[in-house]
Amino acid sequence: MDIRLLIVLLPVLAAASWALYNIGRVALQQFRSM
């Protein structure tokens, strides 16, 4: 595994997981308020 690839992928993965977490949290709130 190339270390440069990891350095590039890490922020992308972090941003993607953060976005998914936020979307899931908002979806749960919408689902509860129904």
Swiss-Prot record:
The keyword Membrane applies. InterPro entries: PSII_PsbY. Residues 1-4 are lumenal. It comes from Gracilaria tenuistipitata var. liui. The chain crosses the membrane at residues 5-23. One of its GO terms (molecular function) is manganese ion binding. It is a single-pass membrane protein. It is found in: Plastid, Chloroplast thylakoid membrane. PSII is composed of 1 copy each of membrane proteins PsbA, PsbB, PsbC, PsbD, PsbE, PsbF, PsbH, PsbI, PsbJ, PsbK, PsbL, PsbM, PsbT, PsbX, PsbY, PsbZ, Psb30/Ycf12, at least 3 peripheral proteins of the oxygen-evolving complex and a large number of cofactors. It forms dimeric complexes. Keywords: Chloroplast, Membrane, Photosynthesis, Photosystem II, Plastid, Thylakoid, Transmembrane, Transmembrane helix. It holds the Pfam family PsbY. This is Photosystem II reaction center protein Y. GO terms for cellular component: chloroplast thylakoid membrane; photosystem II. HAMAP family: PSII_PsbY. Residues 24-34 are stromal. GO terms for biological process: photosynthesis. Loosely associated component of the core of photosystem II (PSII), it is not always seen in crystals. PSII is a light-driven water plastoquinone oxidoreductase, using light energy to abstract electrons from H(2)O, generating a proton gradient subsequently used for ATP formation. Belongs to the PsbY family. The lineage of its organism: Eukaryota, Rhodophyta, Florideophyceae, Rhodymeniophycidae, Gracilariales.
